[in-house]
Curated annotation (Swiss-Prot):
Protein residues bound to prenylated FMN: I175, Y176, R177, R189, W190, L191, R194, G195
UniProt KW Lipid biosynthesis keyword: no
Record's protein name: 3-octaprenyl-4-hydroxybenzoate carboxy-lyase
Transmembrane segments: none
Amino acid sequence: MKYNDLRDFLTLLEQQGELKRITLPVDPHLEITEIADRTLRAGGPALLFENPKGYSMPVLCNLFGTPKRVAMGMGQEDVSALREVGKLLAFLKEPEPPKGFRDLFDKLPQFKQVLNMPTKRLRGAPCQQKIVSGDDVDLNRIPIMTCWPEDAAPLITWGLTVTRGPHKERQNLGIYRQQLIGKNKLIMRWLSHRGGALDYQEWCAAHPGERFPVSVALGADPATILGAVTPVPDTLSEYAFAGLLRGTKTEVVKCISNDLEVPASAEIVLEGYIDPGEMAPEGPYGDHTGYYNEVDSFPVFTVTHITQREDAIYHSTYTGRPPDEPAVLGVALNEVFVPILQKQFPEIVDFYLPPEGCSYRLAVVTIKKQYAGHAKRVMMGVWSFLRQFMYTKFVIVCDDDVNARDWNDVIWAITTRMDPARDTVLVENTPIDYLDFASPVSGLGSKMGLDATNKWPGETQREWGRPIKKDPDVVAHIDAIWDELAIFNNGKSA
């Protein structure tokens, strides 16, 4: 499935009953969030609010509110197919030359996909059909949502922020929330280790006192949106990855006021700059932890131009205690992570980020254990291999006889295979999510690893327990006579 733009994707969703148009007037202040939250928790469709109160621009919510729609956005039929996306990323992260003709033939599809990586630059684009600049710029005309009662102000949530460092050819795409503080002013909340913030820091060092160009695209095609939240290798641009997903080159266009390139089909583009030293207090906002975060200062983004399509659609979301849209994305992208981790650690059987763990704060890993201390090596690998897991607070490692996605299995392994003192690893003074108020210092906290594997010689001096297993002959016999027993009157029981 290929989508040229967001509207193509919405057409398909509507045809499949995955999009609901809301014609009743609904307020972007709190009301859209309430409707979207109820719908997402019920596994419902994407929502297009055609008449937001006080605005003429429709609001799109819950676009990726189910794992199925995330898979569709990546051009796949279902979530299980996302493993193939992960295998492609693993290949791109550490490409290997073919070992022979047969291997070359097997890898041919991957090499063919690479042809879609370069971007296609357009002279004109749909995202520039309407242009507003200077004093005419007014962000208040966009139906920016206020999601929770104690939120400080309306908040842009799905903007793809485009930046470029002074020493880089490649642009960075990142998703950072942006608080509305004026008709042409937003607060750019990016954490110091994120790509946009790093580009900004390098710019300030190379060009002291000079304005840093920034553009924000809203309502890009699904492949580009998802490319910005997927763990692409550092050497691969998000646009290139979007081309791989889509099967066609990503079309971009140069901005009106700067040299940054934005998705040509985006619904809305905000162009402007950050003035070094211009900061503002951001928050509080309800976030994916289920709490309001503390107030902190971040750079101010001044918008000089707004370009948009005719009849533009504003793409938005909310974040709150899981399940929310980021949690759903986490469930789907979990399938992408598995092959990438297995490429580096072949002993990994499965990897799971429970959505109730706020998408990434707790990971369960199952392995084919091969030696004493193996579980601890895997813990350290998870924390260090992909930057997406630098904020993971808890890593639980189990044997491959445990289902990583079944809490009954995981809790059984923890309570029967762990000694708290011997099998718990604590690491202090590590990077922690700024939003994690449980850490003693903002951005710095501890991590815990739990070794819930069977212990090998060298890890214990005691005889290890042998799991109870049923007699297969008895099981087969009881299966054969189960219906005659009529215990439940409905055939076999679990």
